[in-house]
Amino acid sequence: TDSVRFHVGGFVRQGEGPRETGYTSNKGGQIKANLTKDFDNGYVRLYYKHLDDKSVGYLPMPMYSNGDSIAGFDAQSDTPHSALFTKTVRLNGENQISSGDIRDGMNPKVDSVGFEAVFDLDNDWRIENRFRKSSISGNFNSLIPAEVGSASSIAQSIGGVGATLSNANTGAAFNDNLAMRIHTFDVTMNDFDSLVNDFKLTKSFDDDTSITFGYYASTQNIAMSWLWNSYLMELKGDNAALLNVTAADGTEFSENGLYAYGTPYWGNCCQRDYDTEYDTRAPYVAFSTKLGDVSIDASARYDSGEARGNYAGAVTSTVDMNRDGEISIPEQNVAGIDIANASPVNYDWNYSSYSIGANYQIDPSLATFARISKGGRANADRLLFGKVRADGSVAKEDAVDEVNQFEFGVKKRFDSLSVFATAFFAETEEQNFEATSQTFFDREYEAKGIEIESTYFIDAWDFRGNLTWTDAEIAKDALNPDVVGNTPRRQADLIYSLMARYNYEKGAAGVSFIGTTDAYAQDNNDLQFDGYTQVNGFVSYDLSENLNIALNVNNLFDTVGITEAEEGSVPENNIIRARTINGRTTSVTLKYAFN
């Protein structure tokens, strides 16, 4: 009807993905819908979303420190994922024997409903409310090489002097020089439900002035179980096989490639169970006005909340995992959850935020602006297993990370050209935990830089570009003071993107460039990645008024671009575990638009 409208959209997908996993690793879909009812003075909109999607999670994988691929494993197109390794058996968060499916990859399951209502009231008041309730669960299951090295040394680290490896599928002796120690990053997301409401009331005045009063409230559950296992695998990209370990006297130290239930190579650090709830309440106020050619806005917010729940770490026991009536060597020490000795989570937090900005319009084509702001975030599950005291409390300085930022910029428009330039300075706190290195972070960063954005239109051509220069350093580090003054890992001095597009009567064609200069792999500032530029091309054509076909080629020149690595220095064998951009990928899209 004239006052009721709706929108329904979504996607369904199925495929292997950009790297060769050996199975259908991207599978699932989403549907989103909304229904809007218009009134004379506002509207009410209802939302619904259902998501159940699986996509492979690519973690750092083996390559040489200069980005070259290792024989048999292409760093740009291969992955340790394999059709010969799809299941893992472990104890779940309740210490019951259960199985995980590596093919689940990143598998969020979300059902979300919500509404928003916006109405204009008498005397220039406006009332708004937005509400959302989400039921969230799922899985994360991927493979991370914990070690890439000599096959014989890895075998002997498990089975002793003279231990050998064999193919877990065929039983044939394994004679390659290199092998991988694989850990399954296996997480069951039991309950990530959330409830969010944002209410605001705005008063507008005749002189371009308005003031808003609001109240935000949310509840977020974080209940999940980390269920790691350890395997050996050949270093190969196309359906790599699992490897078994046999001692010199014939004793079997593994079964179907699994040599440990847990991660003894990491000290069995990471078998974990979380069951926590985080509540947040935040009143806020915002003000804006215009004084001649100067626009001013200011806002303030006070966040407070509480964290309640418990968490438990690892404990080992003897368990007949395959129920065959015998206890194998891996079954002698099975990592489970220490439920009997769970630790409490019981702390509160609060912090204030503000932002003040001004824009001065010098003339219709030139303006300057400035902003000073302070914000923060309450730390949640990353504090557990490190910063939470025995009674569940947390130090005030650990509960919240704050950010202070200053910006100043200029905006200039010409007939066909626009240029925006912003200088910034930021101070950022970080409390964090990295599972793959079992490292806690308690530090502060300082960064200053300049960001430039520009657009240029001439005839049928469209050019766009942006670049950011950043000078960042680790200003403080409570746990590792040796890195103070160093550049934060993965932070390049310059990042940029450029795009050129030609628009013709029935479509468009163009090319884009995304690039970065050199960056350090880790905070010790030793191993450094080369900068790179990724070139992408695209072309589209309207087959009819409603039907369009498009061709996209990403990484047109098959460039190697390393984005992160576990190692901070080049190891003796020159092999690192790193993540690189995908090699060349091509897609063809057919789109039909309904009238």
Where are these regions (language model features)?
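Repeated loop/turn-to-beta-strand initiation elements of outer-membrane beta-barrel proteins
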Residues: 3-6, 41-46, 125-127, 208-211, ...
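Residues on the lipid-exposed face of transmembrane beta-strands in outer-membrane beta-barrel proteins
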Residues: 1, 33-37, 115-119, 197-203, ...
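Structural signature of Gram-negative outer-membrane beta-barrels, strongest in the C-terminal barrel
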Residues: 192, 204, 208-220, 225-229, ...
